[in-house]
Structure formats: structure tokens, C-alpha cells
Amino acid sequence: MRTSISLVLVGLAALAVAQRAEAHPHILVDAHVKLLFDQRGDLTAIANVWDFDEAFSAYAIQGYDSKGDGNPTRKDLQPLADINMDALKEYHFFTRVSSGGPPAALGAPTDYWDEFTDEKMKLHFTIPLKQPVAVRGRTVTVDVYDDEYFAAVNFPADQATAFADEPAGCSNLIRRPERLDATIARQLAQIPVTQRELPADLHAVTDRLVNAIVVQCP
């Protein structure tokens, strides 16, 4: 069985138990995503800002507040960011880039840090691709999700596809998953925090809860 996602995110086995021990998902994430392109128009990296829910955030920052005023600095939180990146690597950062073949290989994260603002922890990080992905004449999809649904990763309502130096003439769309059926949601709510992997029938459902950015270029 893989490492608990609570360990992935904060390195504390007690975290999810203290917050949402009774239900999947245990952590809520709003993922803001920007696609980065080089001068040739190839996709080179994905820049991310993840906003965690307030309950999770309040617990996650405990022990990292050097001033004791409830507002840890970016410097305070850097050890936590190091833990985040090292552990999320096992899950490919909940990110998959594909263009019809096998998923693109991801490199080591760069420009990463945590901040605490507006009662939420925000994780900033950029994932470079080991090799640029050509987008001309093809459809490229960037999926962002946790297939085990321990963390519910969503594109926020105001998320618009954000490009940096994108090729001219490209179109894009945001694709969000359908709402969970109430019966499935109740079944997920009965799964304890200690169970990372879902039963096959439920995994078949959560594996479709994919947020995607779909890019098409002439």
C-alpha cells in the first residue's frame, strides 16, 4: 500500500485523523494551473498554486510559526514545502501530461514554497517536463487529480486556462468532472483515513474525477 497522502502533504500521520477521519476526501484543494511554453511554442512546464481548505491549513502550519502569532512566514514554512515536494513526487504531483502516447516524464519541481494567507495554506510549485512536448498539430491534455480521492483536487470556478508565451492560434478548454452521485459519495464517506487505496468499484468512479486542460494547436 502506498504512503498515506496525509504523510505526503505534511509529514504528520495524525493530520487527516484529526481533521476528517470519517470520510473521503480528507483534504480539499483548489488548483490554479498555468501552462508554460518556450520560444518554439513547445510545452515546457506546469506552474501551480494549490489552495488548501482552512481546517487542513490550520493543522498543517502547527509547529512552523516562529513568532507564535498564527502567521508563519514563507521562511518558516520552507521545511514543510520541502516535505511536500519530496513526498508528492511518489504521486507524480497529481499531474499527467499526454498527447496520445504515454504520459510525459516530469522533472524535479522548482520555484516551490508554502505561504499562509487568508487562513489558507498555499503551495506554489513548478513542474518542468523532462523533454518539451510539441503541441503543433496535436491535442495535449494536462490532467490534475488524485485518482484515490484522498485529496479532492478541483479547478476553482474562476480558473481560466492561463498560458505563458503560448503558440499563436491555439485553442483551449477547461474540463471538469461531473458531480459525484449521492450514493457513491456516501460510500466514500465510510472509508477511514487509514485506507489509502479504494475498492475497485469506487476507484473506477474516482479515476474519472479528472480536471483537465485540453490544448489544441494547428
Task: Report the location of each language-model feature.
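Positively charged n-region of N-terminal signal peptides that target proteins for export
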Residues: 1-5
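Short solvent-exposed loop/turn micro-motifs enriched in small/polar/acidic residues
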Residues: 28-29, 89, 107, 208
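N-terminal signal peptide c-region/cleavage motif recognized by signal peptidases
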Residues: 18-20
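Mature, soluble, non-transmembrane domains
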Residues: 100-218
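Early extracytoplasmic/domain-onset interaction patches
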Residues: 25-52, 56-58
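Bacterial N-terminal signal peptides
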Residues: 6-16
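Structured domain cores in non-transmembrane regions
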Residues: 55-135
